[in-house]
């Protein structure tokens, strides 16, 4: 059985980990980092870049550099208006009100689903793991925010499938963090709160640990709140101040906006350890009078003032989670901070003041979720023993009933996997079919909740209203993904639905995208081979020119002409990037040089032999003259 990897697919950064020798290990990527930026870019020639290389070129290519794609996963276009305003790339409405990202590849406009972009990030993490392990990787545990709904979880699973990964489990991020924190504390009984504030989402989960059982008691959160929002407050503040001074709105220039975004993110990070920082962006824009520079000092106090209301938004979910878990603040033994945004001092103070205790900072907030995912992967593969994970569904699940009311079948914070059935009936006489409208959310009215799908059960025998008995069954698997069926008890006729994600991706579309991803991987390999071949040709051209300068005058004229002809051909083929002829041009030049080298070697040998013969002749002709000498007797010497 191959290794199952653990992946934290984050809004800002992603991490991959694996169990090795019974211990979870974060895998270092080809760039030498433990975290991979969740960024995908498309260059002018259509080459996709993922991770640090994509992030590095974002300033010069803002419209084709995609980041924070997690905020669009499994969402309708109408739900992401705030997110769209925060990114410089183009987000358009797709079929059925879905989200599509528009990029320009090789002069052509192309639409990508959020799942396809996420799949590119997952492919990079998959390749990182394969290079480290030395074997193919086909299975993974992928984490999601605890408050992700059914559609968002399905979209994440689809992204994994497109990337060529069988997703063995969709795991809630706070649960993964608790798993990583509590693995060596299995013999203790603890009640812990996991406060997870990442780049784009916020979760709070209350768990009980004891005897190797990790039981989630309640979860709450906000999938529209994270570090991106803090960055945006800084961006708006800096842009507004600059506009007051110069009369120019930098947000209207995609390149300036991207520079501003990077500067805001950097300032936010610096203000976690420093009391003030300076944003310095030379040549940020230009007018008829010349270039304009942006230099602005920002204090921690100002930053905290800008984000105070956002941090305050994390308090009501904490209160609700404690209420749902039927616990008081004093009952919590440990508060674990997860996600890069928890490094912000105001966030830490808010959490510590709420719970009345110091937060536990023993875990790395960037890596702990991936480590937990790797542990869960170890549980699934049998590598980790004596660990039982009991997670919950974050939101109410139910159906629409008479009067547009949502009738709940599975309440929020129910332990999963679970199955629940309930009997419903018809609303009018002689009704032969019923529409089952499946909903997710915590509001009373159906219209205020998230629609997961509709299906029709027909063939019901005509009868007065209230007589037919229709059994509706909700089945949630361990990934938190829902399956619904309806059965007429009189006829036994059944209709079921596997709720499709709001992304609208069918199994056929997922397979097409997976095939496309495989093709892109093959294209990437081919492109890499071509670049290596160009580099080989480049080196050969350089070495040949160097050798001709040094030894050219020692070569026979015909051989030198042959080398120069082959060299010119290779230069032309290299310049034209003619890959069909590159191999033969390299071989031709190598052969010409080898033939000339043999002649040169023989000439040097012959020259060496002549030198040797000349030396011998000189010795034979008495070239050594005897010196005159006188014998001195030792006694005579003493006398002298």
Swiss-Prot record:
Induction: By stress conditions e.g. heat shock. The keyword Lipid metabolism does not apply. Keywords: ATP-binding, Chaperone, Nucleotide-binding, Phosphoprotein, Stress response. Residues 629-640 have a biased composition (Acidic residues). Residues 600-640 are annotated as: Disordered. Belongs to the heat shock protein 70 family. This is Chaperone protein DnaK. It comes from Rhodothermus marinus (Rhodothermus obamensis).
